[in-house]
Amino acid sequence: GSYLGKYRKTHIPQVAPGFYEKYFFKPGNLGYPVFDTAYVKLGVYICYDRHFPEGWRALALNGAEYIVNPSATVAGLSKYLWELEQPASAAANGVFIGAINRVGTEEPWAKQMGEFYGSSYIVNPRGQIEAQASYGDDELLVHEIDLDMVREVRDTWQFFRDRRSDLYGRLTEK
């Protein structure tokens, strides 16, 4: 293949003891690029980014049809959100989402951090999970998607057309 570009994780977490990403990484500054592949217009939204709906919308408005969200997320509060946020984001933006999470533990921090819960899945633009991997096994999830569904859902719901960006100024203020 060839190099298409890069995305840098936009939101850096500091949410749990022993989880110090903010000490090692700076927030990304490249915006929300979409990459034209031979098969799909692809967006990337990394791990903790998924908790911020604005980025999903920016990727969709930039033309993404399929957005991948690679993650390394452990059990606890985020498991419920894992099952909720990405289907809701797919439906709100008329995109497919590949929700990718690792499995197992990371030594020597396993006792402190817990277990990564896998459960990767592919969700369609209607917010329905079409394929899902298991909680604890290393797996390769392969699934064929129907890109016509992106246009169909966007044409039906018209969420982009009916946005009221004139009223959303507060969303971009600090």
Residue ranges and their predicted role:
Residues 1, 5-7, 133:
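Short hydrophobic alpha-helix segments
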Residues 1-2, 18, 39:
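Glycine-centered tight beta-turn/hairpin loop motif at sheet-sheet or coil-to-beta transitions
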Residues 4-6, 34, 98:
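Soluble catalytic domains of enzymes that build or remodel membrane lipids, polysaccharides, and related
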Residues 9-24, 137-155:
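A short, polar/charged loop-to-alpha-helix boundary motif
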Residues 23-26, 110-112:
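Short Gly/Pro-enriched turn/cap motifs at secondary-structure boundaries
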Residues 30-62, 150-174:
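Cysteine/selenocysteine-centered motifs that mediate thiol-based redox chemistry or coordinate metal-sulfur cofactors
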Residues 35-38, 125, 145:
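Active-site beta-strand termini and strand-to-loop segments that position acidic
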Residues 41, 47-140:
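CN hydrolase (nitrilase-like) catalytic-core segments centered on the catalytic cysteine
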